[in-house]
Curated annotation (Swiss-Prot):
It is found in: Cell membrane. Pfam families: EFG_C, EFG_III, GTP_EFTU, GTP_EFTU_D2, LepA_C. Its EC number is 3.6.5.n1. Required for accurate and efficient protein synthesis under certain stress conditions. May act as a fidelity factor of the translation reaction, by catalyzing a one-codon backward translocation of tRNAs on improperly translocated ribosomes. Back-translocation proceeds from a post-translocation (POST) complex to a pre-translocation (PRE) complex, thus giving elongation factor G a second chance to translocate the tRNAs correctly. Binds to ribosomes in a GTP-dependent manner. GTP binds at D23, H24, G25, K26, S27, T28, N140, K141, I142, D143. Keywords: Cell membrane, GTP-binding, Hydrolase, Membrane, Nucleotide-binding, Protein biosynthesis. This is Elongation factor 4. NCBIfam families: lepA, small_GTP. SUPFAM superfamilies: EF-G C-terminal domain-like (SSF54980), P-loop containing nucleoside triphosphate hydrolases (SSF52540), Translation proteins (SSF50447). Its main location: membrane.
């Protein structure tokens, strides 16, 4: 292709993504767009086609982002090239969203006609506005009996401030309004900027590991072009690789001769290790490099940490390999080796949130077949010591001696909760119970309220989301961003089994709740740990002070069964002998802690 043809082709490219709250019909809309543009034959079509992980389809959520090229013949007779970049809607995966938005010029905002705007819709819209995207509102599910498109139209204008007069009324499920959406993309989404003949500049927005071809980069070409045989260079570390294949996804990978400015596709270049490629890095040509890199993504810091241990200790290396492979595709997962007296060798992993943690655990068990024990999640605390140091600690077992601690700061989040009027009471009560600090409350319309709180992240990590859903019958929607660190009155609670500390059961708790939490956990463990041949005391301690105790009674054999009648001293002798044996057992006996016991520390209910 000569330069003129390339520029003409670039004018026909439209890059867009779909943003929406969970369950507002984003993946279904993507399916309809694929059908309408005949990208996928009827035979291959299946629901949630872009959600390729089993886990995504089961949970009905989108986790990874996917990029696809479609051809659309518009009403003006021209054929346009669409690149649809599918994004997740869940709050834990905003990182994935920000990555896909960086590769687009436009975004379709899907809002449910019955539910209206929800907290994550807002969060994602602000991300899109930060990236200067053209936003096309679509009001979906208009065939629902409860749909009220006009109210939603008004809401989009009032709450987000977008002009919704031309918002498409659609039903992705019934296929209504799909063509209008496609025409709007052609008219309103701008063609990509960028010079076809400038030096190559491409943004890596995802990477996938393939056992045969090495790391495959998903890129959005900003300037220039790349073809097979080019030698590419990664700008962050200067490493060079030879391109073996370039192509696009139509969901399946299809190889092409070249990718040019505006294209979204993949590059394989025999890259061996995942560590060489960073999502957000810039790819350029070694022979004619670009002068400066593109603005990369901001690094996402993991907010929630937990220990992951293989149940069979010889699987440690398998677990490391599995984590490395997951990290290839999941830039936000962090891990480092750690050891625990109770659980042996494992890893301390950092996650964006609880759903992220859940998904990683399930993928490890499913895709790699490793049985795991997860410890209670914790957050990163800042500890100011008496000698003027500040420590960052994410693992309760690394807490310094209480006498060295001046004060402890914990991360707070700014939580935005949208909820129908009737449930304001329960939500505020829940937030207060989770040590929330009330900020503001705005009425969005006659019956929906937006409440903003500062809440400690450690309280959200436990079960805030589940509690919120159950106290509002599922109507609340919730989004949070990290705000700052604040001093809190926190203490570390240890659990002793048979007078031995089990490091994996330690956790950090606010002093006001320490006594109740200790009591609940001790009772829970009593139910979960099987009875032994000897009595096992379970104690919850803060420092050297025991705040709660419960005993697991010993199993015992009736040693008097063979004594008929018999003298009392004979019986006493047998009982004393049994007692001495139990005592000896207790001195050397160790207690097996089942997996449920570790999880019980998680599901701390205020029962």
């Amino acid at each position: 292709m000569n330069l003129q043809e390339m520029n003409a082709r670039k004018e026909k490219i439209r890059n867009f993504s779909i943003i929406a709250h969970i369950d507002h019909g984003k993946s279904t809309l993507a399916d309809r767009i694929l059908e309408q543009t005949e990208t996928v034959s009827k035979r291959e079509m299946q629901a949630q086609l872009l959600d390729s992980m089993d886990l995504e389809r089961e949970r009905g959520i989108t986790i990874k982002l996917n990029a696809i090229e479609l051809n659309y013949k518009a009403k003006d007779g021209e054929t346009y090239i669409f690149h649809l970049i599918d994004t997740p809607g869940h709050v834990d995966f905003t990182y994935e969203v920000s990555r896909s938005l960086a590769a687009c010029e436009g975004a379709i905002l899907v809002v449910d006609a019955a539910q209206g705007i929800e907290a994550q819709t807002l969060a994602n819209v602000y991300l899109a506005l930060d990236n200067d995207l053209e936003i096309l509102p679509v009001i979906n599910k208009i065939d629902l009996p409860a749909a009220d498109p006009e109210m939603v139209r008004q809401e989009i204008e009032d709450v987000i401030g977008l002009d919704a007069s031309e918002a498409v009324l659609a039903s992705a499920k019934a296929g209504i309004g799909i063509e209008e959406i496609l025409e709007q993309i052609v008219e309103k989404v701008p063609a990509p900027q960028g010079e076809v003949d400038a030096p190559l500049k491409a943004l890596i927005f995802d990477s996938v590991y393939d056992a045969y071809r090495g790391v495959i980069l998903q890129i959005r070409v900003i300037d220039g072009s790349v073809k097979v045989g080019d030698r590419i260079q990664l700008m962050s570390n200067g490493k060079e690789f030879d391109v073996t294949e370039v192509g696009i996804f139509t969901p399946k990978a299809v190889s092409r001769d070249f990718l040019m400015a505006g294209d979204v596709g993949y590059v394989a270049a025999a890259i061996k290790t995942v560590a060489d490629t960073r999502v957000g890095d810039t790819v350029t040509l070694a022979s004619n490099p670009a002068t400066e890199a593109l603005e990369g993504y901001k690094e996402m810091n993991p907010m929630v940490f937990a220990g992951i241990y293989p149940i069979e200790s010889n699987k440690f290396n398998d677990l490391r390999e599995a984590l490395e492979k997951l990290q290839l595709n999941d830039a936000s997962l962090r891990f480092e080796p750690e050891t625990s007296q109770a659980l042996g060798f494992g890893f301390r992993c950092g996650f964006l949130g609880l759903l992220h943690m859940d998904v990683i655990q399930e993928r490890l068990e499913r895709e790699f077949g490793i049985d795991l024990i997860m410890t209670a999640p914790s957050v990163v605390y800042h500890i100011n010591t008496t000698d003027g140091e500040t420590l960052e600690v994410a693992n309760p077992s690394e807490f310094p001696d209480p006498t060295r601690i001046e004060n402890i700061e914990e991360p707070f989040v700014k939580a935005q909760i949208m909820v129908p009027n009737d449930f304001v009471g329960p939500v505020m009560e829940l937030a207060q119970r989770k040590r929330g600090i009330f900020l503001t409350m705005d009425y969005l319309d006659a019956n929906r309220v937006n409440i903003i709180y500062h809440i400690p992240l450690s309280e959200i990590v436990f079960d805030f989301f589940d509690k919120l859903k159950s106290s509002t019958k599922g109507y609340a929607s919730f989004d949070y961003e990290i705000s700052d660190y604040r001093p809190s009155n926190l203490v570390k609670m240890d659990i002793l089994l048979n007078a031995e500390k089990v490091d994996a059961l330690s956790f950090i708790v606010h002093k006001d709740f320490a006594f109740e939490r200790g009591k609940v956990i001790v009772e829970k463990l009593k139910k979960l740990i099987p009875r032994q041949q000897f009595e096992v005391p379970i104690q919850a301690t803060i420092g050297n002070k025991i705040v709660a105790r419960s005993d697991i009674k010993a199993l015992r054999k009736n040693v008097l069964a063979k004594c008929y009648g018999g003298d009392i001293s004979r019986k006493r002798k047998l009982l004393e002998k049994q007692k001495a044996g139990k005592k000896r057992m207790k001195a050397i006996g160790s207690v097996e802690v089942p997996q449920e016991a570790f999880l019980s520390v998680l599901s701390m209910d205020e029962e």
